[in-house]
Amino acid sequence: MDSEIENRIILLESLIIELYITKLREYGYVVIPNVLTDTEVDEAKTLFFKWKNSIPDLDKFHNTADPHGIFKFHQVGHQEHAWFIRTRPKIIEIFKKLWETEELVVSFDGCCYIPKNCTKKDKLWTHTDQAPCNKGETCFQGFVALTKNDERTLIVYEKSHLLHEEYFKKKKYY
């Protein structure tokens, strides 16, 4: 590919990321499609199931320990699938632009998996990941979907980020 064309593509991708960040700051969330290629999604799923299937009785423990489908145990955030996802170039680029820095430190607190044969009734789990006493934008959480998520999914409340400080002030966290 011609280097001029390649530079234009990089510039266009950069501008698109900036547009998504503008939407994030306005609405409190944004959906960015195609952050991972199909090949990267397949690799991440392969690595996840390799880890998941390596732990005896994990499904039984998981269904008992967490009613929301979130894996928080067995060092999930340090497994190969977690590192694979967080080191993808597009993900890194998004967070570089979001925080306006080249120096990133990231965490991966868990992952969500609910098998198709799960019969548990879903319950809302409304919460915020930003600490109650923090003001302004101090926490951005990414969610990388490896499936279509047409049965269960993440729920976000548009512009709820604008109520964070006021809500916790009323709860006397400040």
Each model region followed by its residue ranges:
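Short, conserved beta-strand element in jelly-roll/cupin
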Residues: 132-150
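Double-stranded beta-helix
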Residues: 149-174
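Non-heme Fe(II)-dependent double-stranded beta-helix
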Residues: 2-26, 33-133
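A structural signal for short, well-ordered beta-strand segments and their strand-loop junctions
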Residues: 31-33, 105-108, 145, 153-156
